[in-house]
Structures are given as structure tokens and as C-alpha cells.
Design a protein with these regions (language model features):
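Single conserved hydrophobic/aromatic residue that forms the stacking wall/gate
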Residues: 1-7, 11
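Ser/Thr-centric signal marking residues that sit
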Residues: 4, 90, 129
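Active-site-proximal helix-loop-helix substrate-binding element of RNase H-like nuclease domains
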Residues: 9-18, 22-24, 90-126
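Conserved DEDDh/DEDDy metal-dependent 3′-5′ exonuclease domain
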Residues: 12-92
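Acidic, Mg2+-coordinating catalytic module of metal-dependent nucleases/exonucleases
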Residues: 55-61, 66-67, 71-72, 104-149
Length: 149
């Protein structure tokens, strides 16, 4: 049973996130095609670096990973290039490095530019998340020395 308030909540979230599902630049492709093409690229790099599985890195990576797995099921894709349960979550890394969980706040603490107007687009969020991951990993020794248990 779908309540009208649920539809209203979805609309409010789209407004808050500035999502325009009918935007002409959206260039949506079929989900199966997008997955297959993405997996081809990932598999190419897995082969190049002799990896058996790719590790998903993301902000709230468990959320993204669950969507990816469900998309594979929907499209009858039997083998994802990603490890089935291992991933690296920049929320967890962000807490250790900055004591923050919100991507914008983590970026601020790490001196990474963050544009609220660009936020929540897949490409922008992926780029910023990659910057956060690299900054934390590359500065690990400095960050590790400041952690007190």
C-alpha cells in the first residue's frame, strides 16, 4: 500500500536534492547497458592489475553496493566485478580522519573544495568522494598520529 504522503516525501527529496528527472541533459540509458559497459571498464582494470574482485569505494558504500547488487539481479547479470561484501566506506574513514560523517563537512576538514550546487550529482559526488579517499589514504600517517583511543 502506497500512501500519498510517501509520494509527497519522494517529491520533497527530489526538490531538496535538486533532482530533475526530466532534465534534457540527463541522457539516461537502459540500466542493463549501463551496468554492462561499466563492468567492462572495471573488468579491464581488474585484469590489468591481476585482481580477482574490485572493491567499491563510496560515501555510504553499503547503500550503493546494495543498489548495485539489486540492479544485477533485476538485469539477470550473474557476476558483478565487485567483491560481494567488502567495500571501503568514506563515511567510516571520514569519522576516523575528521570526526565528521557528512561529505561536505569531511571535505571542509580536509581542505577539499565542495560545491553545494553541484552536490548529489553522481559524477560530482564520485569525484569528491575519490578526493576524500585519496587524501585520507595518502595522509594516513599524519591522521593516524592524531587519533587517540
Amino acid at each position: 500500500l502506497v500512501k500519498s504522503s510517501a509520494a509527497s516525501d519522494v517529491y520533497k527529496r527530489q526538490e531538496f536534492l535538486k533532482l530533475d528527472l526530466n532534465h534534457p541533459l540527463r541522457n539516461a540509458v537502459e540500466e542493463e547497458y549501463a551496468l554492462q559497459e561499466s563492468f567492462k571498464i572495471i573488468n579491464k582494470y581488474k585484469s590489468k592489475y591481476e585482481c580477482s574482485r574490485a572493491i567499491l569505494v563510496g560515501h555510504n558504500a553499503f547503500f550503493d553496493h546494495s543498489f548495485m547488487l539489486e540492479a544485477c539481479i533485476r538485469n539477470n547479470i550473474k557476476k558483478s566485478p565487485f567483491h560481494s561484501f567488502s567495500m571501503i566506506d568514506t563515511v567510516s574513514l571520514g569519522v576516523l580522519a575528521t570526526r565528521q560523517t557528512v561529505l561536505a563537512k569531511i571535505c571542509k576538514e580536509l581542505d577539499i573544495d565542495y560545491d553545494n550546487d553541484e552536490a548529489h550529482s553522481a559524477a560530482y559526488d564520485a569525484m569528491v568522494t575519490a578526493q576524500v579517499f585519496c587524501k585520507i589514504i595518502n595522509d594516513f600517517d599524519d591522521i593516524n598520529s592524531s587519533i587517540k583511543c
